[in-house]
Amino acid sequence: PDQSTHDWMQDQGMQTHFMAEIERYGFDKVMDTAIDQALQAGAEHLYISLDVDVIDPAFAPGTGTPEPAGLTPREGFPMLRRLAHEVGIVGAEIVEVNPFVDPGYTTALVANRCLIEMITGVAMRKAGLPGPHYLDPGRAGDRWYQTP
């Protein structure tokens, strides 16, 4: 965001994290920090508003403001699932999807998968599955690989 918007967000108590942090500390560390901040602030649940232009336009071209070097689905999907699983969500929205500028319908498919990942996180939370980075052992190759 521009500086005035960023200042307003800080005045409202919003936490922000930027790509520079991810580049310096790694995606998992920044996610750990963001989740810790939400929990320490007393959040019982989150409302997720996902602006689809955070996804790299190679994967989500159908938006009004495509942002080069955005998140890939491999980064974004686990992030959404993890937020819904570890903190819990009360609702979500995906905004800025414009199918009129995406003849391949790619953006709608990515947006749909984002919703599926959040719903999966909610189901994992309700089922009491283990914490961060949980992967189904049968699908994660545990029968072929030694896990730490």
For every predicted segment, state its role.
Residues 1-148:
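Conserved alpha-helical scaffold segments that buttress catalytic/binding sites
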